């Protein structure tokens, strides 16, 4: 991952140094040394700060001329078997990708699962969460324009993204590389445990 992604950012609230310490250990495990901490924008409600934080990183990456950017949230944790999945999936990613999700959650009520674009890549049609995803540099300007058009609509950033999937090349790595660690969510204000891999397998299996 270190060599594939041009820029890597981790969104972290100033009041959560514990999470920054924890995610650094995760990245060290993956031999990622160039990740940069991005101080999360604190707002009330918290999801607004999340929205603005992601937008700010997109704008910074575009301004820096990034070839691509990987954005992580500070509760992203690697699956123990992430490496074989990454080694396989990176060979299957075409050069014309727009977004790649390294972790995601699917609608459990979905009647139409995301199709496989390759053995280790799903062509996403409906996925949520923003704890681990990447954006191709060529798509940054269009994505920024689209996200800015959603300001004031009271729609969380992950939903804003997902509504664009039908028009772009958005892929999900399968099996996933990152999950969102169970624990207290500063955005939702409660303890969460999304059981990501179980969720994705459930949706894929029930629709086969």
Model-found features: residue ranges?
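An acidic/histidine-cluster motif and surrounding catalytic segment
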Residues: 1-72, 76-208
């Amino acid at each position: 991952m270190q060599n594939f992604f041009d820029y890597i950012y981790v969104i972290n609230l100033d009041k959560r140094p514990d999470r920054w310490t924890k995610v650094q250990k995760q990245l060290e495990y993956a031999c990622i040394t160039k990740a940069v901490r991005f101080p999360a924008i604190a707002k009330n409600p918290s999801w607004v700060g999340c929205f603005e934080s992601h937008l700010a990183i997109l704008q910074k990456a575009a301004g820096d001329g990034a070839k691509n950017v990987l954005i992580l949230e500070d509760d992203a944790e690697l699956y123990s078997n992430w490496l074989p999945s990454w080694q396989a999936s990176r060979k299957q990613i075409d050069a014309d990708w727009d977004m790649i999700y390294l972790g995601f959650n699917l609608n459990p009520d979905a009647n139409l699962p995301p199709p496989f674009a390759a053995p280790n890549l799903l062509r996403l049609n409906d996925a949520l969460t923003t704890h681990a995803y990447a954006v191709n540099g060529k798509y940054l300007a269009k994505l920024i324009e689209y996200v800015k058009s959603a300001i004031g609509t009271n729609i969380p950033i992950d939903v804003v993204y997902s509504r664009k999937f039908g028009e772009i090349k958005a892929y999900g790595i399968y099996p996933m590389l990152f999950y969102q660690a169970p624990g207290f969510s500063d955005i939702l204000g409660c303890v969460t445990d999304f059981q990501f891999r179980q969720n994705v397998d459930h949706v894929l299996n029930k629709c086969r």
